[in-house]
Amino acid sequence: MKIDYLTLFPEMFDGVLNHSIMKRAQENNKLQINTVNFRDYAINKHNQVDDYPYGGGQGMVLKPEPVFNAMEDLDVTEQTRVILMCPQGEPFSHQKAVELSKADHIVFICGHYEGYDERIRTHLVTDEISMGDYVLTGGELPAMTMTDAIVRLIPGVLGNEQSHQDDSFSDGLLEFPQYTRPREFKGLTVPDVLLSGNHANIDAWRHEQKLIRTYNKRPDLIEKYPLTNEDKQILERYKIGLKKG
């Protein structure tokens, strides 16, 4: 996969993209990273990339010329996913990360200021994505967050494919509780089932815990999840247990 970032602050990406999984993905030729400062593509002597909005209003708007010019230097095809980070976009999700992990080429347009000239949005962009109902100073941090979520799903990046298959959201539920050594710590013990060696019982316990954890923390996900009759019985027993205290 190749990822290009159009940004006014390419140095922001160094710390995140040159360590841990991102670094290994590049070393193993699973990922190619390129940052482009679109200020270099400004058309006046002051390298101006923003201007006042037509019709008045607060803040500055990113001009179309630098972004369009920068895009012309990228090897963009009809299959390239050009992503605009903006609050009005589709909320980012694990499902979106899975979809994007199958792309060969992604371009992130990371803006600043009040917004983008609408012609950037309508003529260059394939996907508008939001990280949530809040506003950040720029698109760099969301782009890096998305990159981490996407790249770890590329086959061969994590080494153990089961690693991301057990993650929260991979099957629509939150992840089950995890434990490691020591068996007892400050009077807190690991559930016996995890030490039993009975993998069928362990899998059943983990699924039950995923259902209960999701029910408690993300009931919206439970509403979307295709509960089996057994799942419904698990949750019903849990609710009865809560009432009994």
From Swiss-Prot:
Q: Which CDD domains match?
A: TrmD-like
**UniProt-listed InterPro entries:** Alpha/beta_knot_MTases, tRNA_m1G_MeTrfase_C_sf, tRNA_m1G_MeTrfase_TrmD, tRNA_m1G_MTases_N, tRNA_MeTrfase_TRMD/TRM10
One GO-annotated biological process of the protein: tRNA N1-guanine methylation
Keywords, in A-Z order = Cytoplasm, Methyltransferase, S-adenosyl-L-methionine, Transferase, tRNA processing
Do you know which Pfam families this protein is assigned to? tRNA_m1G_MT
Residues that hold S-adenosyl-L-methionine according to the record: G111, M131, G132, D133, Y134, V135, L136
Instruction: Name one molecular function that GO assigns to this entry.
Output: tRNA (guanine(37)-N1)-methyltransferase activity
Where is this gene product found?
Cytoplasm
Q: What is its EC number?
A: 2.1.1.228
Reactions catalysed, semicolon-separated, are: guanosine(37) in tRNA + S-adenosyl-L-methionine = N(1)-methylguanosine(37) in tRNA + S-adenosyl-L-homocysteine + H(+)
- Transmembrane intervals: none
What GO terms fall under cellular component here? Answer: cytosol
- Record has tRNA processing as a keyword: yes
Q: Which PANTHER family match?
A: TRNA (GUANINE-N(1)-)-METHYLTRANSFERASE (PTHR46417:SF1)
Q: How does it assemble?
A: Homodimer.
What this protein is reported to do is described as: Specifically methylates guanosine-37 in various tRNAs.
The family database entries (HAMAP family) matched by this protein are listed as: TrmD
> What is the similarity comment for this entry?
Belongs to the RNA methyltransferase TrmD family.
Q: What is this protein called?
A: tRNA (guanine-N(1)-)-methyltransferase
Q: What is the organism field in this record?
A: Staphylococcus aureus (strain JH9)
